[in-house]
């Protein structure tokens, strides 16, 4: 993509890629970062999201510095954490984890935190943390069993995907919807634009 600086997304998430594409921004490369996402003992949700986004950015930066085509590109990383109070919910991989998450979320408010970390071509780190409050309806055992059976939850923070079936569980959202999906679009695009990335480059003939 000639005519603009390159952009690397440090994620393999189809949702984050789709959100960037929705904003008319197409990364030149994906460099998913292999980072241990286990919270440290006593770690608070905000701190966890910030730490992991930075760790993903640093890991991906090492990778692109070895690539002549991508060295000096903008690098974007993000991490999403779902929490009830101070309790961080897992990125569910097991049926039991998903069931436990859903029971905990049932009929309650929870918060979704996404930390976005941008590395500029000059190597500066810029970071934003976005918080969204979400309320679920009271889930029946049939709701929980049916949703777990869908498999949609697998690998998702908090054991659900708001852009899928679980969207029907949501009573109220206060804040950014795209933040819950995994990348707060307004803040991400503002961050990129504020650091000199030509965010409107891909808008021409985007329809």
From Swiss-Prot:
CDD domains: Maf. The active site is at 79 (proton acceptor). GO terms for molecular function: dTTP diphosphatase activity; UTP diphosphatase activity. Its cofactor is a divalent metal cation. Gene3D superfamilies: 3.90.950.10. The record marks 15, 80, 163 as: Important for substrate specificity. It is found in: Cytoplasm. One of its GO terms (cellular component) is cytoplasm. The keyword Cytoplasm applies. GO terms for biological process: nucleotide metabolic process. Its EC number is 3.6.1.9. Keywords: Cytoplasm, Hydrolase, Nucleotide metabolism. HAMAP family: Maf. Nucleoside triphosphate pyrophosphatase that hydrolyzes dTTP and UTP. May have a dual role in cell division arrest and in preventing the incorporation of modified nucleotides into cellular nucleic acids. Belongs to the Maf family. YhdE subfamily. This is dTTP/UTP pyrophosphatase. The lineage of its organism: Bacteria, Pseudomonadati, Pseudomonadota, Alphaproteobacteria, Hyphomicrobiales.
């Amino acid at each position: 993509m000639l005519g603009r600086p390159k952009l690397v997304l440090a994620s393999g998430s189809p949702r984050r890629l789709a959100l960037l594409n929705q904003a008319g921004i197409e990364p030149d490369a994906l460099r998913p970062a292999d980072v241990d996402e286990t919270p440290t003992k006593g770690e608070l949700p905000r701190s966890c999201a910030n730490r992991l986004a930075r760790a993903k950015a640093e890991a991906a930066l090492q990778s692109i510095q070895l690539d002549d085509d991508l060295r000096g590109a903008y690098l974007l990383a993000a991490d999403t954490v779902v929490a009830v109070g101070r309790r961080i919910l897992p990125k569910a991989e097991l049926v039991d984890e998903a069931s436990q998450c859903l029971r905990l979320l049932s009929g309650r408010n929870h918060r979704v935190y996404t930390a976005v970390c941008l590395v500029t071509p000059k190597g500066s780190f810029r970071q934003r943390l976005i918080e969204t409050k979400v309320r679920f309806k009271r889930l029946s055992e049939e709701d929980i069993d049916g949703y777990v059976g869908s498999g949609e939850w697998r690998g998702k923070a908090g054991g659900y995907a708001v852009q899928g079936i679980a969207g029907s569980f949501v009573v109220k959202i206060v804040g950014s919807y795209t933040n819950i999906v995994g990348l707060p679009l307004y803040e991400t695009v503002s961050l990129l634009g504020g650091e000199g990335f030509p965010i409107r480059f891909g808008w021409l003939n985007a329809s």
